[in-house]
A protein has these predicted regions:
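Catalytic Zn2+-binding segment of zinc metalloproteases
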Residues: 160-176
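Hydrophobic helix-coil surface modules that form long, contiguous segments used
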Residues: 1-157
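Short, intrinsically disordered, charge-balanced linker/junction segments flanking boundaries
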Residues: 15, 158, 177-181
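Active-site metal-coordination segments of metallo-dependent hydrolases
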Residues: 93-94, 173-181
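Glycine-rich, histidine-containing beta strand-loop boundary motifs that form or position
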Residues: 115, 167, 180-181
Length: 181
């Protein structure tokens, strides 16, 4: 069993929520960080119509999510981040993912995948279908500058946007960089 029944219940609640819901709380992530896993957990990933893939795993991850409705479909906008990403990530990441999906879908075509995930990375931005790794971290005391905040928001918008170009459209980002960056 990968998620506890309580976490599964939160996930189901997040599907219907227009605000992020904690799936793995900061307290649960802290407990996970303190102890080693007993046994194994198996996650099975399957994706259609993707040209690349990426995934992230850490017992330190806090996980929040919210549903984004496109007609009769719900796409899950989600974020995974360690405690070092807060308060910035909890406040902004998933909301920015959801907003980006709505905006790109309005101006191009509906987002076809079931999830869009933003993963905290210390200082990079990199995209794969349905998942992107984004920088932006507050200082160790939890404070952050406007530059850090808007830099994080900008890189999330940019990397989630790469789901459309080049991932879904399947443009060649090396040949047509003007479409990519």
């Amino acid at each position: 069993k990968v998620l506890s029944s309580e976490q599964r219940s939160r996930y189901d609640k997040a599907k219907k929520s227009d605000e992020p819901v904690m799936i793995v709380t900061p307290e649960e992530a802290l407990e996970n960080e303190k102890k080693k896993a007993k046994g194994t957990k198996t996650w099975v990933f399957q994706a259609e119509n993707v040209r690349d893939f990426g995934f992230a795993s850490s017992r330190k991850f806090i996980w929040d999510a919210q549903g984004v409705t496109f007609g009769n479909r719900t796409v899950m906008a989600m974020s995974y981040y360690p405690k070092e990403g807060n308060p910035l990530w909890e406040k902004y990441s998933t909301r920015v993912v959801a907003h980006t999906l709505k905006t790109y879908s309005h101006y191009t075509f509906p987002y076809p995948y079931p999830v869009a995930i933003s993963v905290h990375a210390n200082s990079i931005g990199m995209e794969y279908p349905m998942i992107c790794f984004n920088g932006g971290r507050p200082e160790s005391d939890g404070t952050y500058t406007a530059r850090t905040k808007y830099g994080m928001i900008s890189v999330i918008i940019h990397e989630v946007g790469h789901n459309y170009f080049p991932m879904i459209v399947n443009s060649d980002e090396r040949q047509w960089t003007w479409m990519d960056e």
